[in-house]
């Protein structure tokens, strides 16, 4: 199973989710991307993840592309606001409406980190139970834009 985590800058939420998923579910593949990637992972995010034993210093934000979307079995958006990316026609996108940690104080980044960890833990449990989709949490597929 390949899970794609999306956020706007791929410098905070999606990076944390990918890292937690890689740690908790090494039997699966995690990808992340953003619709408008930053030039680096936010320093407060790097520090918050270091506090839980995950090093993000070598990660670089990247733009989500069609190949990533096509490869993904499950797509999770984190407050992504780019309809061309986050409303992938014909696919369900699970929306985790999470605050952007980019301009938050360290204690707020920790709170967001912990919420992401809890959501990833729940996702991994669903995947292992054979239930990747969370009832009522997914947006319906969007019609193709012609």
Question: What is the predicted function of each stretch?
Answer:
Residues 18, 43-46, 71, 90, ...:
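Surface-exposed beta-strand edges and their flanking turn/coil or helix-capping segments
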Residues 1-65:
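Conserved active-site segments centered on acidic
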Residues 1-2, 68-78, 111, 139, ...:
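Cytosolic catalytic domains that perform sulfur/thiol-centered chemistry
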Residues 59-98:
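Mid-chain, well-packed structural core segment of small domains
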Residues 83-146:
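Phosphate-binding/catalytic loops
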Residues 10, 49, 75-76, 116:
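Conserved small-residue
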Residues 28, 32, 56, 71, ...:
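Secondary-structure transition/capping residues
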Residues 38-40, 69, 100-104:
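A short acidic, often aromatic-flanked loop/helix-cap motif at beta-alpha or helix-coil junctions
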């Amino acid at each position: 199973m390949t899970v794609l985590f999306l956020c706007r800058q791929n410098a905070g939420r999606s990076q944390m989710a990918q890292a937690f998923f890689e740690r908790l579910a090494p039997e699966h593949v995690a990808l992340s991307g953003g619709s408008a990637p930053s030039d680096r992972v936010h320093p407060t995010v790097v520090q918050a993840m270091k506090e839980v034993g995950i090093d993000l210093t070598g990660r670089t934000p990247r733009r989500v592309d069609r190949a990533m979307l096509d490869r993904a079995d499950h797509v999770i958006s984190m407050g992504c606001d780019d309809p061309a990316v986050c409303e992938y026609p014909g696919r369900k996108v699970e929306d985790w409406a999470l605050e952007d940690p980019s301009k938050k104080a360290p204690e707020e980044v920790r709170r967001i980190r912990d919420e992401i960890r809890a959501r990833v833990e729940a996702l991994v449990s669903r995947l292992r139970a054979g239930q990747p989709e969370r009832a009522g949490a997914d947006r319906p597929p969007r019609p193709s834009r012609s």
